[in-house]
Structure formats: C-alpha cells, structure tokens
Amino acid sequence: MSVETQEPFKRINVDEAKKLADSGIPVIDVREPNEYQAGHVPGAKLVPLNTFLRSPRQHLPASGPVLFICAMGQRSAVASEMAAASGATDVYNIEGGTNGWIAKGYPTEK
C-alpha cells in the first residue's frame, strides 16, 4: 500500500501560468542572472534560488498567490516548497519553466 503525500503547492503548465501572470499574479524567476538576462517572463522578478532559500519571506508578496519559474520546473519546485513552508498558501510551480514558455511562443523580456 502506498501513501501519497499532498504537495503544499500547485503544479501548473505554461498555458495556465500565462493566464495567471496576465491577470497580475507576481512571477518569481529563481534562475541565475545570466539565464534571466537571456530572456524571462515579462515582469518576472529575479531572485536566484540560493538567495531565495536564505530568506524566503523577504521575497514573497505580503499576501495572495505567487508563481515560481526556472528553466524547466525543478528549481522552482524547490522554491515553491520553501515558500509554502514559510507560510505562503497560494503557491504555483510552473512546470516546463521558461523553456516551455518560450516553446509556446509566449513573449519574453531581456
């Protein structure tokens, strides 16, 4: 018998993420500066994962939902887990990350 544990954050695809980002939900990009500068989701705030892990509350919005993105969805899952552990209750991890965002043809900023 296996026991499934519920993750404290929601995994969403890039299509769902685009809708949420367009509605004004903040996006935190946890990639490294050189990755971010090569292209990122419009309006995304750069907070490299190591920086976020040192002081997650400092980088989270005071309330409301937040989206995390990286290149593929792994680093952002770590950040999402830490955000939830720090008290955030409406946390989304963008599966497929920036690579998936670009593959869909969604806009980026440099």
Segments the model singles out, each with a brief description of its role:
Residues 68-69:
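Short, surface-exposed ligand- or partner-binding patches at beta-edge/loop junctions that are enriched
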